[in-house]
Amino acid sequence: MDKPLALGKIQGNIIGGFNKDYETFLFLNVLDAGKARGYLDEIKNEIATSEEVLAFNRLFKQLRKRHGGELGILKATWTNIAFSAAGLDALKIKDLSKFPKEFTDGMAARKKMIGDLGESDPSNWIGPLGSKQVHAVLIVAADSQSDLYQQVTRYEEALTACGGFSIVFRQEGAVRMDDPGHEHFGFKDGVSQPGIRGVDKPTGEDPDQGNPGQDLLHAGEFVLGYATQTHDEKPGHDGPNPDPGPISENGPAWTENGSYMVFRRLAQDVEGFHNHVKNKAAELGMTPELLGAKLVGRFASGCPLEKMKPESNG
């Protein structure tokens, strides 16, 4: 039996995605540890919890279904914060040796293993992203551009005034307004998320499945301090072993209920992808829609590949 998730101590967007149309990422450098820690103490209650975000998302879905739309029915602006190993060191945090090497080294130092070579070399990354100067990332997500601007402006002014941080890079994000709910290659987004035991409930007869085709996994795969998956197959069971595995403990004891975030800024060649799919599909004697589904793992509509129904695409 898995222990209950302390959702009030887990940051929102770890369990329970923000699911907002607009986001800003503020990349921070620590100038003064004491002042920086003082400011973090001031805003700690502004950091969203998974408990809050999950409750909001459930209510939002209920109201959208009831009203037949989502315009203006319910709004919230969320904040999340993450720290790099260099940032924790700059904040005078102890026990850094207990973190995994992958975290303390950082992506730039592991470029050969990751494949960040040639044009993708960290020396070519925009701004300070390939250096150790990024100490923290403050993520703000909102339903409207105006709500986002208001909150981000407040943080920018406060960060400057506190004297503990400098803002070294800013990344804006927004959903596609021309094709809502779809990523840039045209495929429905957000449909490949695993289910989490203790959060997502079975919707059918199989107790190990959330939504149809969605395996329920132990929370320790995503959050520190909880049971992980066991890699041994369970005789007579189809799918991931439902029995809990070892507790995830990749860090000091105080990291319980925390997680690891990876920020990757990628260039996507949308035209190149579609041209390749079109040409290769002709060689293979299949439609571009089917080949695209085979490459991505689902049709553009989000229809599972197992259905093998190109006409479901759209």
Task: State what each model feature region is.
Residues 1-314:
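Long, low-complexity, Ser/Thr/Gly/Pro-rich intrinsically disordered segments that act as flexible linkers
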